[in-house]
């Protein structure tokens, strides 16, 4: 989704580069990947509202409200994005890092409805409210996207804000239940399928 260190990790790319056929990324990220040993023919760079198809899967690079850069000298030198992934009959939305904005309704109108939406809901603060969504905004985003199941993401890993590590999960659930929005929060390492969404919610974070 963008080149911040918590989203584009050198060690992870080195482990993946010989195991995948394609890396899809926003414009400019390819330079990082090439330096780390990824071959040019493995890299597909896209601008907003461009797409790439392979077999029966479409990948749509879409707007988000964030920024990029891995240091003070290259801020906003590469693109940041969200993604829609369509493999009939399934449609998935991945927000990447993003503040709340009208782009979400635009995406929902053009590409929705979505079966599952993975939406940024952590590391929020009023000082940078345009870069990350509060849980209440993440639920609004899920509604704008016309999504069936909301998966809160971007919480419980890196500490970038002052809230407790599990507050995003607790608050997301609270707001989702208020509006009758289905949600699911998989445990770390859990493999999910559509059947999971009919199971009782496992509040696994309460064990820690």
List where the protein language model places each region.
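Metal-dependent catalytic neighborhoods of phosphoester/phosphodiester hydrolases
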Residues: 9-18, 160-170, 195-196
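Alpha-helix capping/helix-boundary segments
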Residues: 5, 29-30, 50
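Active-site metal-binding motif and surrounding structural segment of the metallo-beta-lactamase
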Residues: 1-25, 112-118
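Cap/insert and terminal regions of metallo-dependent hydrolase folds
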Residues: 22, 28-31, 91, 99-188
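Helix-loop-beta element that forms the nucleotide-linked donor phosphate-binding surface
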Residues: 33-47
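Core dinuclear metal-dependent hydrolase active-site scaffold
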Residues: 11, 46-112, 188-208
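Phosphate- and divalent-cation-binding pockets in alpha/beta enzyme and binding domains
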Residues: 7, 15, 31-35, 102-103
């Amino acid at each position: 989704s963008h080149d911040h260190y918590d989203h584009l990790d050198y060690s992870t790319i080195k482990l993946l580069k010989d195991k995948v056929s394609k890396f899809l990324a926003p414009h400019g990220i390819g330079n990082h990947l090439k330096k780390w040993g990824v071959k040019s023919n493995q890299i597909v760079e896209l601008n907003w509202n461009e797409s790439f198809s392979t077999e029966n899967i479409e990948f749509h690079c879409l707007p988000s409200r964030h920024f990029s850069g891995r240091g003070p000298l290259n801020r906003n030198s590469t693109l940041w994005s969200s993604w829609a992934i369509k493999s009939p009959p399934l449609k998935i939305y991945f927000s990447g890092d993003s503040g709340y904005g009208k782009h979400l309704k635009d995406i929902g109108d053009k590409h929705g409805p979505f079966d599952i939406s993975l939406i940024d809901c952590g590391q929020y603060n009023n000082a940078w409210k345009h870069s990350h969504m509060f849980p209440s905004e993440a639920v609004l985003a899920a509604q704008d996207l016309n999504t069936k199941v909301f998966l809160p993401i971007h919480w419980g890993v890196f500490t970038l804000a002052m809230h407790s590590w599990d507050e995003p999960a607790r608050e997301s659930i609270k707001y989702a239940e208020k509006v009758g929005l289905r949600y699911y929060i998989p445990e770390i390492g859990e493999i999910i399928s559509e059947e999971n969404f009919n199971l009782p919610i496992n509040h696994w974070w309460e064990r820690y």
